[in-house]
């Protein structure tokens, strides 16, 4: 009949490796509604670190499919590449262009968290659904530096 949880809970549905402290954990949100995607995993309220770190678009994403066409897809698997690409652009800005030549993983995560913007309906940040907020690369790069 399919897979299901014996006793489902709304929180604590993130799995390894997203629960590790040094990784950048990504949740999904609906960019058209500026709202959390309810299928996205949630962190635990009881751990000393809040996960996910941030959320990226993961609902109704246009993506290439085999055969040379496109389809509308949904899932955190489509949110994570937004963050990966943003991390790569930050590293280009920092290391290649010399704005932060000693940029490393934890600093990339800190820049992305700093630039995250609020998602509607939340008072507390970080939280177990969208972390520090939704991805915004433009706000992640320090002002005055191009």
Segments (PLM) and residue ranges:
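Intrinsically disordered, low-complexity segments enriched in small/polar residues
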Residues: 2, 119, 129-131
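Extracellular S/T/G-rich loop segment that most often corresponds to the catalytic His/Ser-adjacent loop
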Residues: 3-88, 139
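Glycine-centered flexibility motif
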Residues: 12, 43, 98, 131-133, ...
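Charged/polar, solvent-exposed surface patches and flexible loops
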Residues: 19, 110, 114, 139-142
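Hydrophobic alpha-helical segments
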Residues: 41, 91-93, 145
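Hydrolase catalytic cores
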Residues: 58-125, 134
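C-terminal domain-closing interface element
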Residues: 123-146
